[in-house]
Amino acid sequence: MQLNDQARALIGAGVNATLVTLNADGSPQVSVVWVELQSTPDGDELVSAHLNEHKKVRNARRDPRVALTIIGADRGTESVVPYLAITGTARIVEGGAPAVLTRLTEVMAPEFNGKFPPPDAPPGFLTRITIDKVTGIGPWT
């Protein structure tokens, strides 16, 4: 699925995303993550990077069903802040986390450029999310 320009702008605006994975017992596991948008021949993917094999990584490897919410910073004239809700299918890729985190740090936490990720960071993991459905409140629905 290809996201529209407004959804792309929100993702690139330096706002956090909330990622929901499923624990083995079916209960939700919620994490705040940084995501970047990457275009592939099959459509857009959201990519989150992790230096360690956190629970969200283990959960997504076991059950790839995930949901993300990205909340806008400005509600404009609306009564509710716009938000982008995405359901998708995750796949875990080993390696590549430092490069993605370096790019995301420039937008999300520029004061840490050159400091995060650390130079000796492990290769880590990428969560690559194929977008199955887009909802929320905003010009992307």
Model regions and ranges:
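Short coil-to-beta transition motif at edge beta-strands of beta-rich domains
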Residues: 13, 63-66
